[in-house]
Regions:
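A generic structural signal for short, non-catalytic loop/turn and secondary-structure boundary residues
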Residues: 37-39, 90-94, 146
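Mixed-charge, glycine-accented linear interaction segment located at domain edges/termini
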Residues: 126-174
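Non-catalytic linker/capping segments at the edges of enzyme domains
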Residues: 1-60, 156-193
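Hydrophobic residues on conserved beta-strands that form the core of alpha/beta folds
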Residues: 31-32, 94-96, 148-150
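Hydrophobic beta-sheet segments that form the core/acyl-binding groove
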Residues: 97-146
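Short, low-complexity, polar/charged sequence segments that are solvent-exposed and flexible
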Residues: 62-66, 118-120, 170-174
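A short glycine/small-residue-enriched secondary-structure motif
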Residues: 44-50, 88-99
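Active-site helix/loop of acyl-thioester processing domains in fatty-acid/polyketide metabolism
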Residues: 63-89
């Protein structure tokens, strides 16, 4: 079954390169495309898996709403690299995220993946390039062209040296003598990737 795509200008065929959203595996990449509507407004296309190692449908067959949160994160990181020129080596640190599903029935998992689109506004609060990029993405979630949620993410991107200063040395003993955990397995995990 092929769904009618309400945004013909967007591609949904394959994910973008995983390095552009700081993911280790292609299966973790949901964003497929983005188009600029105006200076700070974008449409970001995504394809959500019907099931996933981290995101499972609930017993009633609705997609995990955390897919929306991860799509916002990936959309912001992708736009930062592809449209704003934030270097690929920069680390992202999330500072605030909020999201709300307004019409959960639109998240029903069907025979074919839905056309997921973020109608997104990108702003740059606290921006101080080239070493620190303050970014915020506010998005309306559209599933098959119908609005069904809204959310936003604030983060900043910084170079490796400043990131290490902020986070401290990995593996340094904590106050109780145990080594501090590696935040993200050494690859920039957490909300910002």
């Amino acid at each position: 079954m092929v769904r009618q795509v309400p945004f013909p200008e967007l591609e949904f065929e394959q994910p973008i390169p995983r390095r552009l959203v700081h993911r280790a595996a292609v299966a973790e990449v949901f964003v497929t495309d983005a188009v600029e509507l105006s200076r700070d407004r974008y449409l970001v296309a995504a394809q959500w898996p019907r099931d996933h190692a981290l995101y499972h449908p609930d017993p009633s067959g609705l997609a995990d709403p955390l897919l929306f949160a991860e799509t916002i994160r990936q959309g912001l990181v992708y736009l930062a690299h592809s449209r704003l020129g934030v270097p690929l080596a920069h680390r992202f640190v999330g500072t605030h995220m909020d999201f709300r599903i307004t019409h959960p029935e639109r998240l029903r998992v069907g025979a074919a993946p839905p056309a997921v689109v973020l109608d997104a506004e990108l702003s740059r609060p606290g921006d101080r390039p080239p070493h620190r990029h303050g970014l915020r993405l506010d998005a309306v979630l559209l599933v098959d062209g119908v609005p069904c949620g809204r959310g936003g993410l604030s983060l900043f991107a910084t170079d490796e040296r400043r990131y290490r200063l902020l986070r401290g040395p990995i593996g340094r003993p904590a106050a109780d003598g145990d080594p501090a955990p590696d935040p993200g397995g050494g690859r920039g995990g957490g909300p910002g990737g």
